[in-house]
Curated annotation (Swiss-Prot):
One of its GO terms (molecular function) is nucleoside triphosphate diphosphatase activity. It catalyses: a ribonucleoside 5'-triphosphate + H2O = a ribonucleoside 5'-phosphate + diphosphate + H(+); a 2'-deoxyribonucleoside 5'-triphosphate + H2O = a 2'-deoxyribonucleoside 5'-phosphate + diphosphate + H(+). Belongs to the Maf family. Gene3D superfamilies: 3.90.950.10. Its cofactor is a divalent metal cation. This is Nucleoside triphosphate pyrophosphatase. It is found in: Cytoplasm. Its main location: cytoplasm. Coiled coil: none annotated. One of its GO terms (cellular component) is cytoplasm. Nucleoside triphosphate pyrophosphatase. May have a dual role in cell division arrest and in preventing the incorporation of modified nucleotides into cellular nucleic acids. The lineage of its organism: Bacteria, Bacillati, Cyanobacteriota, Cyanophyceae, Synechococcales. One of its GO terms (biological process) is nucleotide metabolic process. The active site is at residue 70.
């Protein structure tokens, strides 16, 4: 069984849809205390901190691995996590509309024992995202839905945000919160 070290409902849904047996335990890691100038390294550090925090509290022998994940959007040299409020979300969207950004998700898998066929590893997967050229009214309507305030980069591809993304280059599930193809490579077939 996999233990997901994340509070993200989207990550949990991805695992459920992929029929990967799992449980969830929120790490409680202070994400604001972890810094790095390069987004791929930042998300790996955050994912590793979450996985290690949960792994350190583990007592259930049925858990074979702990997975920590974290995502940020890199846009024109800036790193966007979740917007602080609606005004910040609107300002970001006015900058992002019609442009590409890079959604980085760090994944850290920690095996819980040496007897499992799982090896511990960390990796960042990056997906390029082309945002639709939205009008100010469309941005205001999307932000007023509340959805952009809950997600890294200010959009949820699996929700209303699916209509405001023109194109992806890379892994679809990565934009939602974790790369299922990467997880398939990491986990044994009989997991």
């Amino acid at each position: 069984m996999l233990l997901l070290a994340s509070a993200s409902p989207a990550r949990r849904r991805l695992l459920e849809q992929a029929c990967i047996p799992h449980r969830v335990q929120v790490s409680g890691v202070d994400e604001d205390g972890i810094h790095h100038s390069e987004p791929p390294q930042l998300v790996c550090l955050l994912a590793e901190a979450k996985a290690k925090a949960v792994h350190g509290q583990l007592t259930d022998p049925s858990i074979h691995a702990v997975l920590g994940c974290d995502s940020v959007l890199a846009f024109e040299g800036e790193v966007f996590g979740k917007p602080a409020d609606a005004e910040e979300a609107k300002a970001r969207w006015r900058r992002m509309r019609g442009h590409w950004g890079d959604l980085h998700t760090g994944h850290c898998l920690i095996a819980t024992s040496s007897t499992t066929a799982i090896s511990s590893q960390c990796q960042c997967i990056t997906t390029r995202v082309l945002f639709a050229d939205l009008s100010d009214a469309e941005i205001d309507a999307y932000v007023s839905s509340g959805e952009p305030l809950q997600c890294a980069g200010g959009f949820a591809l699996e929700g209303r945000g699916g209509c405001v993304v023109e194109r992806l280059n890379g892994c679809y599930s990565n934009v939602i919160g974790l790369s299922l193809p990467l997880l398939r490579q990491w986990l044994p077939q009989d997991f």
